[in-house]
């Protein structure tokens, strides 16, 4: 008999591992086998799918067996042996409680029905408690194959379902790579075939739904159809995604052999899984969220508890977990469980100190503790010397403090409480911003301008540690995504290598793995320094294929502090956000932007400039400014609250509500701020080292509708950012600037293979954008596939497909940042996005996922349509109604402000070495304005048309005047012709001088 490599074979293998009954058949219906002794893996009971009651989502046989063994009097009280109204009332009560409270709370606390208290689960026994151990052994952990769960779609079946005492806790969809299906297919099956309206899939009825193949594991806590969000549950391999090879079996067997054992699952239910409620302060609406730990969170907490239980107080631990990896929950779970940790039958720690400045962590600790104890009796906030002693006397086990108050706590620990044992959890990678921040510290940072030697919270903690030495009666648990050298030396694990003593983290979850797993987004993929932006724009003048209208769109690099520079950069940011983010429906239209500035003065300037320009655009959106303390601006004392019109503490909540879309920051919210709706960042501040990583990482938080992010940087370059990320990311994937000419080269190479012709591209794009049926596209694509198969050898096929993917990837990036369009590129990109999934793959490649993506193109089509139409708003934006006051959108500079304009010119274009600077200045301020003002067409436009048309005629007149200077002043002509930044500045300046002058 050959090996069973089918999906059912994998299912049987898992069940055999869990039950210890090799490929056994279920017991007969209504027959509950006795639980076997919990030895090794043979500790799950094999359930029978026929025992499952679909109406009440319960395995009646297993539930009855548990109650008969533990609370026998309830069998008769609830008439469980008969399908009677009495039994139905009990089952209805049970399911009602699960629907209201969730399976986690029902298992932990049981239910009340009539006069009876019903225990539905016995938790982990304390060591030495024989009776508790006997009760725990009476729990019935069962696994059922091919569970038919639906009353309507009676043939629908889940591959596996896990039950505790007859109550479902988890479901499985299994796939097998040997049959060319993967975990992605399992996820699609959940999204497509598992109706979230089914009772079993309602919120809170199961702790997790697992998609599993022989290589990867994903899970979802709340099925929502296509909106279901599956998170990775993998061990990681080589600091990346996936799982290591397993010499003993499948790569994923850790899930059922180590994680979902009865004791392991019980631990998760008791200490990790939870439902938290968030109340919207404005609407009062409560939102519920179910939490299940990811693998690295479960792994780090369990490893820390094991090691701390063995060594007791006095050890140091460094946990390097990537930004966005869920450190807050990891810290909360660890803090809670350290309370009950024992060493030699005594508490390992008397008190747990948590050092953090993040309100979110404070709340998560409270949410976690709330599941098991009274928060007020367990948690205290230490802000002054003596608070620790007071809380200890009150019996509080967890004390939360800020980094600024931390020295007082350390003094108490080292002096008054040297005989007690402490665990100190430090969330030290997050500067004190956005939560209970120290205004004095933040203001000092703002004044310093965030240089590389800026003292972050991590530095402060290190300095405090150095000053007071590490206390022998305390263990330190330091969590960070970006450990500095001092942090590694203070908290890392020492290990010898050669004649050196090195240090490493106790546990790590790398940025690379988080990105590979799709849990955070790669902020380096679309990082664009403005210098590169300019280089890209500059290359178009010699390339006739480009759309010159887009090339004329203004984009300048203004880094000076005067209002004119801020205004122009603000326009660039606002225009980009509207046209490249909102217009493309990023994050389902919910995208937000962060503007990172170098100080409070600059932030306030941006706030006013962005606010004013949003009004001029008639945009419905608004901006929020964030800085600490009070600032003198224009002779008036202002705060963020006075400018925003609401309290500072409301900023995190307001930015996710419309109409707010821009968050303008001065050394605030740049670290420790977790907001998945942040999509775009505009940086006008020098960044380097850890600060650069922490700042850009604000964008990386995942969201079900978030597929990319964008950074536009006015001050830093790719090499600086690369060096900043390298220590914390094993593989540097940020490339140098992308040359748009590569698209010409790729297109030429693809065209040369003659797999398609221009008419096929035109035809498919026209059909697609016209909304035709899908079957009208296939004949065109299939003809190209036939040409690909028949006319190209294998090497040519590999080369063609590789270049096609490169074109799609490169254009997808460049298309969002170039301020001009190329219709042939856009059309080829649309065409290749359909063609590539149809091209035969190498034998080892499975394109089933690609084919499914090619069919379901709704969101992508919307983006592509918007991308192709993005030039239309440009044209429309230039057409304004004739203003009733005869003016334009803003008052142009008056002649008496010419010195300011010239100073801006000299500052910005100081690199131009004029042979005769005085003569050039005279030409710009006198000769050229006089000649342009005398132009007849320009005079007519000023008198008889609007400002928009007057500007058009002005630019034509200026061009004629400059051409006339070619013989007499080649220097000025050359700058005007070769330097588009100077050309635009000169046009703005001359128009400002001449427009308000009376016509001759």
Where are these predicted regions, by residue range?
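ATP-dependent helicase/translocase motor core
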Residues: 2-351, 360, 364-375, 404, ...
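Catalytic cores and motor modules of nucleic-acid processing enzymes
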Residues: 25-27, 37, 54-59, 63-76, ...
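Interdomain helical connector at the RecA1-RecA2 junction of SF1/SF2 helicase-like NTPases
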Residues: 246-255, 486-590, 607, 611
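Inter-Walker segment of RecA-like/P-loop motor cores
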Residues: 370-411
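Conserved RecA-like ASCE ATPase "motif II neighborhood" in helicase/translocase motors
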Residues: 396-428, 432-443, 457-466, 644-652, ...
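Post-DEXD/H (motif II) to motif III coupling segment of the RecA-like Helicase ATP-binding lobe
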Residues: 434-523
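Conserved C-terminal RecA-like helicase domain
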Residues: 556-663
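Conserved segment of the helicase C-terminal RecA-like domain
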Residues: 698-727
């Amino acid at each position: 008999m050959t090996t069973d490599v089918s999906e059912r074979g994998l299912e049987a293998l898992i069940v055999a591992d869990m039950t210890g009954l090799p490929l056994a058949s279920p017991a007969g219906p209504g027959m509950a086998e006795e639980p076997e002794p919990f030895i090794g893996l043979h500790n799950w009971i094999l359930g029978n799918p026929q025992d499952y009651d679909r109406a009440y989502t319960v395995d009646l046989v297993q539930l009855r067996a548990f109650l008969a063994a533990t609370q026998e009097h309830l069998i008769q009280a609830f008439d469980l042996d008969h399908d009677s109204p009495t039994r139905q009332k009990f089952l209805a009560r049970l399911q009602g409680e699960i629907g209201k409270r969730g399976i986690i709370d029902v298992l932990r606390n049981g239910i009340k029905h009539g006069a009876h208290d019903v225990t539905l689960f016995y938790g982990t026994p304390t060591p030495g408690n024989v009776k508790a151990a006997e009760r725990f052994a009476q729990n019935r952990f069962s696994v059922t194959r091919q569970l038919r769960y639906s009353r309507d779609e009676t043939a629908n079946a889940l591959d596996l379902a896990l039950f505790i005492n007859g109550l479902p806790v988890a479901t499985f969809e299994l796939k097998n790579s040997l049959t060319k299906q993967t975990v992605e297919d399992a996820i699609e099956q959940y999204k497509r075939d598992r109706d979230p309206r089914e009772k079993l899939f309602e919120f809170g009825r199961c702790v997790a739904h697992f998609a599993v193949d022989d290589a990867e594991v994903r899970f979802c806590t709340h099925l929502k159809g296509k909106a279901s969000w599956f998170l990775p549950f993998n061990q990681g391999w080589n600091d990346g995604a996936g799982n290591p090879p397993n010499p003993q079996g499948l790569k994923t067997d850790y899930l059922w052999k180590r994680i979902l054992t009865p004791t392991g699952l019980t631990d998760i239910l008791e200490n990790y899984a939870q439902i938290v409620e968030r109340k919207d302060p404005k609407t009062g609406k409560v939102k519920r969220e179910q939490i299940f730990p990811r693998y690295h969170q479960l792994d780090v907490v369990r490893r820390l508890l094991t090691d701390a239980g063995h060594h007791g107080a006095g050890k140091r631990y460094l946990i390097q977990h990537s930004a966005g990896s869920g450190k807050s929950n990891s810290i909360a779970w660890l803090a809670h469980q350290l309370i009950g940790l024992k060493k030699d039958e005594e508490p390992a720690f008397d008190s747990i100190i948590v050092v953090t400045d993040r309100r979110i962590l404070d709340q998560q600790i409270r949410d976690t503790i709330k599941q098991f104890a009274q928060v007020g009796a367990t948690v205290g906030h230490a802000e002054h010397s003596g608070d620790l002693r007071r809380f200890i006397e009150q019996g509080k086990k967890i004390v939360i403090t800020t980094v600024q108050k931390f020295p007082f706590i350390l003094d108490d620990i080292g002096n008054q409480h040297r005989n007690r044992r402490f665990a100190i959890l430090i969330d030290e990678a997050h500067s004190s911003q956005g939560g209970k921040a120290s205004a004095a510290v933040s203001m000092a940072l703002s004044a310093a301008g965030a240089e590389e030697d800026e003292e972050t919270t991590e530095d402060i903690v290190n300095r405090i540690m150095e000053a007071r030495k590490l206390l022998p009666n305390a263990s330190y648990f330091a969590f960070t995504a970006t450990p500095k050298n001092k942090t590694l030396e203070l908290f890392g694990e020492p290990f010898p290598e050669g004649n050196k003593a090195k240090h490493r983290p106790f546990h790590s979850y790398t940025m690379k793995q988080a990105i590979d797993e799709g849990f955070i987004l790669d902020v380096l993929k679309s990082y664009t320094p403005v210098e590169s932006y300019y280089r890209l724009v500059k290359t178009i003048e010699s390339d006739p294929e480009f759309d010159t209208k887009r090339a004329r769109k203004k984009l300048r690099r203004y880094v000076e502090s005067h209002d004119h520079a801020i205004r122009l950069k603000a326009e660039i940011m606002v225009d980009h956000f509207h046209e490249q983010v909102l217009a493309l429906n990023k994050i389902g239209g919910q995208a937000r932007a962060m503007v990172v500035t170098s100080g409070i003065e600059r932030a306030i300037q941006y706030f006013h400039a962005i606010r004013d320009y949003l009004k001029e655009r008639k945009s419905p959106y608004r901006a929020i400014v964030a800085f600490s303390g009070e600032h003198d601006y224009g002779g008036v004392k202002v705060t963020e609250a006075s400018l925003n019109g609401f309290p500072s503490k409301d900023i995190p909540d307001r930015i996710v509500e419309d109409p707010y879309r821009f968050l303008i920051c001065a050394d605030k919210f740049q670290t420790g701020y977790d907001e998945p709706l942040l999509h775009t960042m505009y940086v006008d501040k020098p960044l380097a080292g850890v600060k650069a990583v922490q700042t850009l990482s604000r964008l990386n938080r995942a969201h079900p509708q978030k597929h990319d992010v964008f950074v536009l940087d006015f001050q830093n370059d790719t090499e600086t950012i690369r060096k900043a990320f390298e220590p914390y990311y094993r593989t540097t994937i940020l490339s140098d600037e992308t040359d748009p000419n590569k698209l010409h080269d790729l297109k030429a190479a693809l065209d040369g293979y003659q797999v398609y012709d221009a008419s096929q591209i035109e035809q498919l794009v026209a059909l697609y954008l016209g909304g035709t049926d899908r079957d009208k596209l296939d004949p065109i694509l299939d003809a190209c596939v036939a040409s690909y198969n028949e006319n190209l050898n294998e090497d040519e096929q590999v080369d063609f497909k590789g270049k096609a993917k490169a074109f799609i990837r490169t254009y997808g990036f460049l298309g969002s940042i170039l301020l001009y369009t190329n219709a042939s590129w856009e059309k080829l990109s649309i065409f290749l996005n359909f063609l590539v999934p149809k091209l035969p793959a190498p034998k080892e490649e499975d394109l089933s996922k690609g084919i499914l993506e090619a069919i379901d193109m709704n969101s992508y089509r919307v983006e592509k349509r918007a991308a192709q139409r993005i030039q239309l708003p440009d044209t429309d934006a230039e057409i304004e109604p004739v203003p009733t006051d005869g003016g334009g959108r803003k008052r142009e500079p008056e002649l008496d402000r010419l010195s300011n304009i010239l100073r801006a010119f000299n500052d910005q274009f100081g690199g131009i070495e004029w042979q005769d600077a005085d003569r050039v200045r005279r030409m710009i301020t006198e000769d050229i304005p006089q000649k342009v003002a005398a132009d007849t067409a320009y005079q007519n436009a000023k008198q008889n048309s609007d400002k928009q048309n007057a500007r058009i005629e002005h630019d034509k007149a200026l061009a004629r005047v400059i051409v006339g200077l070619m013989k007499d002043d080649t220097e000025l002509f050359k700058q005007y012709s070769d330097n588009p930044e100077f050309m635009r500045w000169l046009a703005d300046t001359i128009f400002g001088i001449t427009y308000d002058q009376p016509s001759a």
